[in-house]
């Protein structure tokens, strides 16, 4: 059994604006549609309906709906899906606040260079035990902690 496309439009016709198509399949041998007797109706086997992408009008209706529990991250009355937060792992009060992992901390017990190489990072009395000061209190915040400066001026409403 062969199937033919009963779509009579030329192939150069552009697609419908909504991207939908309908093809009707008929059974029987392929025949020349121009010489076909009009009294002989082809038997319809099935109809295939294809639906493409949504139209521009339908796409513009899709909006994000925020739940009431969504956090206003910037305090400006705007709710956003792109949230820039820095997670600081909770630590015990006697833990170091440096960002090194346990493996890096254990590596600090090994001395690969002269004590002069580590003079800025360790105090002489605790050399080989632990890091006492990596970043001073006067150090500038990193790019994630700093408040971005915007060229645009914000209006207070």
Curated annotation (Swiss-Prot):
Output the superkingdom of the source species. Answer: Eukaryota
Q: Which UniProt keywords apply?
A: Nucleus
Q: Where is this region: Disordered?
A: 1-76, 92-157
Task: Give the UniProt subcellular location, in the record's own words.
Answer: Nucleus
Q: Provide GO CC annotations from the record.
A: nucleus
Compositionally biased intervals (Low complexity): 53-63
Compositionally biased tracts (Basic and acidic residues): 1-10
**Compositional bias per record (Polar residues), positions renumbered to this chain:** 11-29
Major localisation = nucleus
Q: Which GO terms describe its molecular function?
A: protein phosphatase 1 binding; protein serine/threonine phosphatase inhibitor activity
Similarity comment? Belongs to the YPI1 family.
Function of the protein: Regulator of type 1 phosphatases which maintains protein phosphatase activity under strict control.
Could you tell me what this protein is called? Type 1 phosphatases regulator YPI1
């Amino acid at each position: 059994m062969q199937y033919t496309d009963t779509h009579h439009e030329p192939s150069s016709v552009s697609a419908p604006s909504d991207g939908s198509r309908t093809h009707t399949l008929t059974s029987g041998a392929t025949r020349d549609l121009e010489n076909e007797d009009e009294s002989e109706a082809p038997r319809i086997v099935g109809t295939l309906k294809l639906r493409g992408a949504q139209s521009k009008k339908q796409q513009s209706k899709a909006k994000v709906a925020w739940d009431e529990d969504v956090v206003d991250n910037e305090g400006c009355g705007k709710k956003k899906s792109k949230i820039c937060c820095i997670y600081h792992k909770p630590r015990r009060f006697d833990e170091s606040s440096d960002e090194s992992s346990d493996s890096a901390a254990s590596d600090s017990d090994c001395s690969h260079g002269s004590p002069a190489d580590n003079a800025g990072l360790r105090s002489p009395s605790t050399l080989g035990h632990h890091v006492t000061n990596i970043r001073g209190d006067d150090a500038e915040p990193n790019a994630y902690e700093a408040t971005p400066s915007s060229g645009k001026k914000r209006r207070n409403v």
